[in-house]
């Protein structure tokens, strides 16, 4: 994936929050990390997050992605994109 012209980020990179670290979320995280975006994944399963951390350069937050406290911990206000899968 590449950033299209007109993106609000001038450096071409985005902070992307992915809610859900399952198969689809992990695939998205991998692609966004390949493009050197700043990726944060929220998931309720610690083992799933640990697996992502061993293979990718990203931040993980364990918790419920629908919980405002979890979103705050993930610094959702700084996100350029939020993907819930």
Region locations from a protein language model:
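Cytosolic regulatory regions of ion transport systems
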Residues: 1-85
């Amino acid at each position: 994936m590449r950033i299209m012209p007109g993106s609000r980020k001038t450096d071409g990179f985005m902070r992307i929050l992915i809610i859900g670290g399952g198969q689809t979320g992990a695939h998205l995280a991998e692609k966004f990390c390949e493009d050197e975006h700043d990726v944060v994944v929220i998931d309720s399963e610690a083992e799933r997050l640990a697996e992502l951390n061993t293979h990718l350069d990203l931040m993980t937050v364990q918790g419920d992605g629908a919980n405002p406290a979890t979103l705050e911990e993930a610094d959702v206000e700084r996100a350029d994109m939020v993907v819930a899968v």
